[in-house]
Amino acid sequence: MIDDTEDVAEFFRYWPKLAAWPDDADLVSWYRNTHTNLVKVLEDAPLDLECATFLLAASPLSMWTRRQASEIAIHRFDAEMSRGITSQFEPHFAGDMLDELLTAFVPRGRPVGPENPKTIHVHSEDTDEHWYVTVGPEQTRTELQGGKADLTLTATAADLYLLLWNRTPDSSVKMTGDTDLMDLWHGNFRVRWS
């Protein structure tokens, strides 16, 4: 697995050269061709594929399949929202994408928590799943079972997924407890490229 701080050069050695960006008139067909190619590559890949990864997963192939599904879903939401269209996600899919965010992305970041660790309980009502995200000064960890939480977020998997990717307002889910923890979340748990 690629370590963010030590293996960046090694990671980019595997990164494919990106094609030239298409003209606006060709963008939709370019995207469809790229999507078709991605699906074919993932379907044709052997189950024991060895390649660079950056998230914990059962296998490199499962990591990249899951990552690309989530990446496409969240940016589909962004594109549709720019046109005033509300995206819908099937509960099981949204639950899996939420699980990727909370168990793979969030724990790999730098410690951001307060001096006294705080726990956010994320409860997906439609999939009956629970995640307990504890933020502290030394690490952030996610467990599937827990006890007392400082803040509980309750909603559908899709609404939680969008909230925790910082796409929708806090009012989109039910919150019980220390809602100031959402300021910590919004300020620290997001993808940054610099």
PLM segments and residue spans:
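Acidic/His-leaning functional-site neighborhoods
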Residues: H123-T152, T156
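C-terminal interaction segments
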Residues: G146-S194
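Short, helix-capping/interhelical loops that line the mouth of catalytic, cofactor-
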Residues: M1-E50, I85-M97, G109
